[in-house]
């Protein structure tokens, strides 16, 4: 049993004497972003744009330097104060077998470039969203996170700057990446080149990310791993809000520039300077301090069983995660999820292997009816936080406060967070993938078949209650005046606010053939894929079909040619324009393997490659079935008749065209 506690940040603590250094490659070019760590600790740094780093270490520490595509470097620290480190390229990666295009291929025999990240690089910190663990770990992949709300903090992913519509293929099935726990992932491969994307059809026009999950191993004793992780999230670079006295002075200055008289007289400025959020006439509310904490908690626990015998291998995983929030005035802002997965693979005879993978995820996102950023729209002097306690019919004071609002700013977001109710967004996901692999070498040497069937169902239900608070405004003449839109409504029970169900069915069949002799290598294949997606909430149904043929030829691993031809169709278009043909081709020349390069030792691998082709795109104008009319009813028609009755009418919502088809990129 391996029990480990991981920190939330791999670089959190430094000690001892300071050393500096530079990391370069064999040509002397600085390596940007190399990891420099004291082995076995969390003490580390990352090289800057000039390949330089600084780090506090102690004598006897073992320094480890690593970067993707290069061999790791280790050095024991003595009395050095400056280090010059040269990393050598990992040429073994050229012989690495990588997943690409529903199959595998040697990295060195590709006419394009791919990037891969391993599972251990994704689990250095607990994150509520799996996508967030990819930031900065894959070249060509841009991760942008725009929210830190628990359960809504997923980053958007762009491959080589394209739109955030890259698809995720998990064990051959397209799905939402966030439905897979990072600890279940074996590796992730990013496909960015034309040929690699073409093999996955029109849905991969913006790129594809291939995820392989852990499967266990044959003839491997059972291993049990227990991981516990904890961390703290810190709100970074939140803008400062102006306080009441600052707001009043800037308002007066702006009015003076425009030729208006001052709105806030010295008496008001003196009142705002007291910084009293409950002052009836001169409130000064510090919403940031009232609303936000400086940190939020993160924790994760996971248990994994894996192993296998001669005929069967298995992997079972159970994970739980909790993320708090930085919001103070709502007890219902947090996110938790539970994930369980099981993978079984068995050899049936000499030529057959079957597998079944099941994954289920249950998540709960609790939130109030407001967010912290809503406070930015309300000046600190708009109204007092509360105006005291409300009174019952008998004149007795009730527990419900009277919250302040104004005629201009009619929403007290502090009150809305406390008294406005809450909702819980519950997401349930179930995924089942089954596959059969046939070795047909008894029929034709090098011939293989793979059949895959996948079913995914996603259900989102939002349960909660929407309530109201008692809102009043202060006037100098009338005292307290009621705002009729805030009635103090309370509800005894919760109800279903919304529901959404999505179901996907995928079928995949591939025949592949490999042949090699006398320096010649051929890899060929034919693939049929069908994807059905049904939104059961509104009966929206879509289907995609495509057939792909691909062939790759390599001579002495120096000269490489690839061809891909695909015939793809989508139900989004009229039957006469649903299908289209997309050819692609690629060439590569591994110059470093030529005889005239043997004496140039500072170059380990040099490849010249190019690709050209067409890729389809189905997501046109954001809506399917543009060849069909879409009607709606309205009641704001013409006033007709003696009684001036306004009639109802029906009208189309869009122009109909029979000629829209796939984009060709």
Regions found by a protein language model. Give the residues of each.
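Acidic, glycine-rich flexible loop segments
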Residues: 262-285, 300, 375-413
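Extracellular/periplasmic, surface-exposed regions of secreted and cell-surface proteins
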Residues: 122, 164-165, 343-352, 357-362, ...
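Low-complexity intrinsically disordered tracts that form flexible linkers/tails across taxa
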Residues: 365-377
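Short, small/polar-rich motifs associated with maturation and membrane association
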Residues: 1-340, 353-355
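Short aromatic-enriched loop/helix-cap "lid" or pocket-rim segments at secondary-structure transitions
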Residues: 8-10, 237-240, 368-370, 464, ...
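Short, solvent-exposed aromatic-acidic interface loops
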Residues: 229-233, 366, 610
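Active-site-proximal polar cores
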Residues: 471-473
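Localized chelating/binding microdomains
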Residues: 126, 130, 156-158, 198, ...
């Amino acid at each position: 049993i391996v029990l480990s506690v991981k920190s939330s940040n791999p670089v959190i603590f430094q000690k001892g004497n300071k050393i500096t250094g530079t990391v370069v490659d064999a040509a002397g070019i600085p390596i940007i972003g190399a990891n420099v760590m004291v082995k076995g600790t969390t003490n580390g740094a990352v090289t800057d744009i000039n390949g330089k780093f600084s780090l506090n270490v102690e004598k006897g520490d073992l320094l480890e330097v690593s970067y993707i595509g290069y061999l790791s470097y280790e050095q024991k620290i003595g009395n050095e104060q400056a280090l010059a480190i040269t990393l050598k390229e990992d040429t073994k990666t050229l012989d690495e077998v990588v997943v690409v295009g529903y199959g595998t291929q040697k990295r060195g025999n590709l006419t394009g470039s791919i990037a891969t990240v391993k599972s251990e690089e994704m689990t250095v910190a607990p994150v509520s969203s799996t996508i967030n663990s990819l930031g900065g770990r894959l070249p060509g992949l841009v991760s942008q996170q725009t929210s830190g709300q628990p359960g809504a903090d997923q980053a958007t992913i762009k491959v080589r700057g394209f739109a955030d519509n890259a698809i995720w293929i998990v064990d051959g099935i397209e799905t939402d990446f966030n439905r897979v726990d990072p600890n279940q992932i074996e590796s992730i491969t990013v496909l960015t080149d034309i040929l690699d994307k073409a093999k996955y059809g029109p849905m991969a026009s913006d790129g594809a990310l291939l995820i392989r999950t852990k499967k266990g191993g044959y003839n491997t004793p059972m291993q049990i791993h227990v991981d516990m992780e904890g961390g703290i999230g810190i709100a970074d670079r939140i803008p400062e809000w102006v306080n009441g006295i600052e707001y009043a002075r800037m308002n007066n200055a702006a009015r003076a520039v425009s030729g208006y008289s001052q709105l806030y007289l010295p008496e008001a400025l003196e009142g705002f300077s007291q910084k009293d959020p409950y002052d009836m006439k001169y409130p000064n509310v510090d919403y940031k301090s009232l609303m936000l904490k400086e940190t939020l908690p993160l924790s994760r626990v996971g248990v994994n069983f894996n192993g296998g015998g001669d005929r069967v291998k298995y992997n079972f995983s159970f994970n739980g995660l909790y993320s708090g929030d930085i919001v103070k005035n709502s007890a219902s802002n947090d996110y938790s999820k539970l994930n369980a997965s099981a993978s079984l693979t068995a050899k049936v005879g000499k030529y057959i292997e079957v597998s079944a993978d099941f994954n289920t995820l249950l998540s709960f996102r609790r939130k109030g009816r407001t967010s912290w950023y809503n406070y930015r729209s309300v000046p600190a002097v708009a109204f007092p936080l509360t105006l005291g306690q409300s009174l019952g019919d008998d004149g007795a004071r009730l527990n419900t406060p009277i919250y302040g609002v104004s005629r201009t700013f009619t929403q007290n977001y502090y009150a809305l967070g406390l008294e406005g109710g809450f909702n819980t967004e519950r997401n349930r996901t179930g995924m089942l993938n089954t596959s059969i692999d046939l070795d047909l070498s008894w029929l034709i040497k090098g011939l293989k078949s793979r059949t895959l069937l996948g079913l995914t169902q996603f259900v989102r239900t939002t349960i909660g209650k929407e309530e109201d608070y008692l809102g009043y405004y202060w006037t100098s003449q009338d005292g307290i005046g009621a705002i009729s839109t805030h009635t103090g409504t309370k509800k005894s029970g919760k109800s279903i606010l919304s529901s959404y169900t999505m179901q996907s069915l995928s079928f995949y069949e591939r025949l592949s053939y490999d042949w090699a002799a006398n320096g010649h290598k051929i890899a060929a294949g034919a693939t049929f894929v069908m994807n059905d997606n049904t939104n059961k909430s509104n009966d929206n149904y879509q289907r995609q079909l495509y057939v792909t043929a691909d062939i790759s030829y390599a001579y002495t691993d120096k000269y490489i040619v690839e061809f891909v031809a695909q015939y793809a169709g989508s139900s989004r278009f009229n039957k006469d324009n649903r299908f289209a043909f997309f050819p692609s081709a690629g060439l590569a020349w591994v110059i470093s393997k030529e005889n005239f390069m043997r004496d140039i030792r500072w170059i380990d691998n040099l490849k010249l490659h190019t690709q050209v082709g067409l890729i389809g795109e189905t997501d046109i104008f954001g809506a399917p079935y543009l060849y069909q009319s879409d009607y709606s009813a309205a009641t704001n028609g013409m006033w007709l008749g003696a009684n001036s009755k306004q009639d109802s009418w029906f009208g189309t919502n869009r122009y109909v065209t029979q000629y829209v088809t796939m984009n060709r990129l």
